[in-house]
Amino acid sequence: MIEAEENTLALPRTLVLVGLMGAGKTCIGRRLAQMAGVPFVDADVEIERAAKRTIAEIFATYGESEFRALERRVMARLLAGRTCVLATGGGAFMAEDTRALIRLHGLSLWLRADLDLLVARTAGRTHRPLLNNGDAREKLAELMAKRHPVYAEADIVFDALDESQDASALRVRSCLLSYLADHAETAP
């Protein structure tokens, strides 16, 4: 469990977590939001609310391009709102206009995880449309090759490990505090 003195984090603006599925955006994001005393928002949940359909249904009915267009609109709305910890879908940061919005209104943090960890964390999950057809390991490797160069544009790069969620959250907090100190950002 996280100790009380380690349970604080002042965010000057929305913290946007990016990375592949299984990197820990949701689990770590919830703990960071608790530390910062701000809401945790899962962009995928907000997309499902806006569409009144699951992500899998959106993909199946409308295809990936329509999903990405909806994702961009929802991200713009969320970034214009109050400060929060925002977990994005794995592909959200790939869109240049979304990255520009994040640069303007948020602080991006890439949760970088190795292939074995991603495979272990996503095994048997059926709510991930991009992994439902074919070999998940191969698909994740392809996504890593395509997305990692773009994810590297994030303000902060954090290496996710196979450790407890509390341990990861504390390490992310340490990275954030160092980044904020180095960049002289303070909470409003």
From Swiss-Prot:
Catalytic reaction annotation: shikimate + ATP = 3-phosphoshikimate + ADP + H(+)
Binding site for ATP: 22-27, 128
One GO BP: aromatic amino acid family biosynthetic process
Pfam families cross-referenced by the UniProt entry: SKI (PF01202)
Family matches, as CDD domains: SK (cd00464)
Leading EC class: transferase
Any GO CC annotation of this UniProt entry: cytosol
Residues at which Mg(2+) binds: 26
Subcellular compartments: Cytoplasm
Residues annotated as binding substrate: 44, 68, 90, 147
Cofactors, names only: Mg(2+)
SUPFAM superfamilies: P-loop containing nucleoside triphosphate hydrolases
PROSITE patterns: SHIKIMATE_KINASE
Xref: InterPro entries: P-loop_NTPase, Shikimate/glucono_kinase, Shikimate_kinase/TSH1, Shikimate_kinase_CS
Quaternary structure, from the entry: Monomer.
Similarity comment: Belongs to the shikimate kinase family.
This protein's name: Shikimate kinase
Organism: Rhodospirillum rubrum (strain ATCC 11170 / ATH 1.1.1 / DSM 467 / LMG 4362 / NCIMB 8255 / S1)
Taxonomic lineage of the native organism: Bacteria, Pseudomonadati, Pseudomonadota, Alphaproteobacteria, Rhodospirillales
Gene field: aroK
